[in-house]
Swiss-Prot record:
This is Large ribosomal subunit protein uL15. It comes from Chlamydia pneumoniae (Chlamydophila pneumoniae). InterPro entries: Ribosomal_uL15, Ribosomal_uL15/eL18_sf, Ribosomal_uL15_bac-type. Coiled coil: none annotated. Keywords: Ribonucleoprotein, Ribosomal protein, RNA-binding, rRNA-binding.
C-alpha cells in the first residue's frame, strides 16, 4: 500500500525539454546551441566515430600491434624458358644482373626461378646461384 509520506515531489524530477531557436533570452536562441559556422552548425552533421575535435585520435596515437614480415621478405621472380630464348643470344650467360639489365625481372629481385614453358633450343651458361632451375628445366637439360 502506498502511503502519503512515501510519495516524492515529481515537479523537481521533471526536466523541461530544451527549446531551441526561441529568442536570445532563452539561452538557446539564434544559433540554437550550435555555434557559428563550421561542420557542427550544418544540418545533418554527425561527428565521425573516434573524432576528437581535430586532435590526433586515440586509434592513431596507440601503436599498431603485431609484426609484419613484409619488409624482410625476399623478392623471388619467375621467368619462362621461352622468354629467355627471346631475350638472350646463344651461349650467353644468364645472371641476375643480366636479367635486371634487360628489365625481365624487378630491380629488387634477389632470386629468379626458371620455369619450363616454351622451347629452349638455345644453349645458355648458368653461372649465377641466384638463378634457380625448376625440376622440368633440369630434366630437359639432363641435370639431376
Amino acid at each position: 500500500m502506498i502511503k502519503l509520506e512515501s510519495l516524492f515531489d515529481i515537479s523537481e524530477r521533471k526536466r523541461r525539454k530544451k527549446l531551441l531557436g526561441r529568442g536570445p533570452s532563452s539561452g538557446h536562441g539564434k544559433t540554437s546551441g550550435r555555434g557559428h559556422k563550421g561542420d557542427g552548425s550544418r544540418s545533418g552533421y554527425k561527428r565521425r566515430f573516434g573524432y576528437e575535435g581535430g586532435g590526433v585520435p586515440l586509434y592513431r596515437r596507440v601503436p599498431t600491434r603485431g609484426f609484419s614480415h613484409k619488409r624482410f621478405d625476399k623478392c623471388v621472380e619467375e621467368i619462362t624458358t621461352g622468354r629467355l630464348a627471346e631475350l638472350f643470344q646463344e651461349g650467353e650467360a644468364i645472371t641476375l644482373d643480366a636479367l635486371k639489365a634487360k628489365k625481365a625481372i624487378a630491380r629488387q629481385a634477389v632470386r629468379v626461378k626458371v620455369i619450363l614453358k616454351g622451347d629452349l633450343e638455345k644453349t645458355f651458361v648458368w653461372q649465377d646461384t641466384a638463378v634457380v632451375l625448376s625440376q622440368g628445366v633440369q630434366n630437359l637439360l639432363g641435370i639431376t
